[in-house]
Amino acid sequence: MKTRRQNLAFLFLIILSNVTVAQKSIGIFDGSGDVGIGVKPGHAVYIPQTQQYIISGAGYNVWADHDEFQFVWKKMKGDFILYTQAEFVGPWVSIHKKVGWMIRKSLDGNSAHVNAVEHGDGLTSLQFRRSPGAQTEEHKLKITHANVLQLERKGNQYIMRAAKYGEPFTTDTVTGIDLGDEVYVGLFVGSHNSDVIETGVFSNVTMTVPFQDVSDQRTQMTLGSNLEIMEVSSGKREVIYKVPHSIQAPNWSPDGKKLLYNDGKGLMHTFDLATRTPKLLNTGNVKANNNDHVISFDGKMIGLSSSVRELGGSIIYTVPFSGGNPKQITPKGPSYLHGWSPDGQSLVYCGSRNGDYDVYKISVNGGEEIRLTDAKGLDDGPEYSPDGKYIYFNSVRSGSMQIWRMNPDGKNQEQVTNDGFHNWFAHISPDGKSMVFLSFLKEEVAADIHPPYKNVYIRMMPTAGGSAKVLAYVYGGQGSINTPSWSPDSKKIAFISNTVVAPTGAVAGK
């Protein structure tokens, strides 16, 4: 197995072999070049296979009243959220070299700007120049050696979030910086030495245009969607498909060949991972499907949740994985499916009866439902462990939303997580060793709601107990990972992140 150092060394060889290559556009960016006068020429390369940017730049500094650095940029307007994981690579000279995100009013060396930066010595800071030629100011974050950098613009407010991968963000903010509506946005590298070129590698780069109409985020699912897969051991993310509308809650088929998701219009689709193409799934006259759908452990059947107003809302159905006419399972709604039993004989779901949402179980043949929880407040997201010993679920009974588990008959209910987040939708890996779940910030949402279009974490922890680790820093929430999404080898997960996507047709990732 290659070590991280070996991987970075390999990337450095790629850099050296591409120093003379000119690219008109670089990945998602419009252009690149050196900022400043008389700067030693730098260069930038995009590696489609890994979706990484390798940027090399020189320059005296990004500081004082003017800057010198290599910049890979895109023009953007309005509000946006920038995210990357950044690493230095190769031999280096100055501890003050810099990598990070930059937002500039112009490409002039003395332009007003805001940047989120990691230094060679580990200093992590939010830097800004309020007007052309003014002195650069700095907010030093409490964290050092951050390799996860996020920079968000909300009007004239700029929010920096930084973390060591696996940990929650540390945040700082500056307000009153007027860079104009249209700005240059991108990644930068500066060497802090005019005669030396330094190199940074940027992974998992996203530029998110967030939801603008905040009148009711609970029901409006209108943003574009990125279908992503992630390797949980390394954190490597890959956008494999993007569309300008809502798709939600990917499930991974047990044979590893396909994903299953719903769209915002209530239709179901399979996605071939080899060809990276979607296909509409025939679900007969059941065409108001929501994001609570699950594939059976043997891969032969799909459980659906679909709205039927006359029956009280969401109703559970089953249908063959190849499609067909669904069979109604639950007699009344709302009923939101979250899990199959490993033997394929039972379904577990969240149901509202008499004004309270609890966990229920029912035979795949229908019949009488069995109530498994009766605590006051919302119980949701029930899912069997692969060995069938537990049903995991999330409950607000403690005052915050946390992960719980119980025996399949509802006995021995015990709390699993207890931390500073609202935790939803635990999904157990096929090998039974790990679980991933969605974490909302308590300062942003109430305990009993899980809205879309929020800065959220997908976290992982051992099922045997221990600390949770952040796997993915995501703009999403509702619809991102509502139902099981592990690959059958327990090495990857699939999920949805959201952004405005130009309506030029669906684009498959490379």
What annotation goes with each model-predicted range?
Residues 19, 94, 158, 303, ...:
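Short secondary-structure capping/junction motifs at helix and strand boundaries
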Residues 7-15, 178, 272, 346, ...:
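Acidic/proline-rich low-complexity IDRs
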Residues 3-4, 23-41, 221, 225, ...:
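Extended hydrophobic/aromatic-rich secondary-structure runs
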Residues 23-216:
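Extracellular glycan-recognition regions
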Residues 2, 19, 49, 83, ...:
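Intrinsically disordered/low-complexity terminal segments and short unstructured peptides
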Residues 8-10, 20, 54, 115, ...:
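Compositionally biased, intrinsically disordered low-complexity segments enriched
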Residues 211-510:
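Sequence signature of WD/YWTD-type beta-propeller architectures
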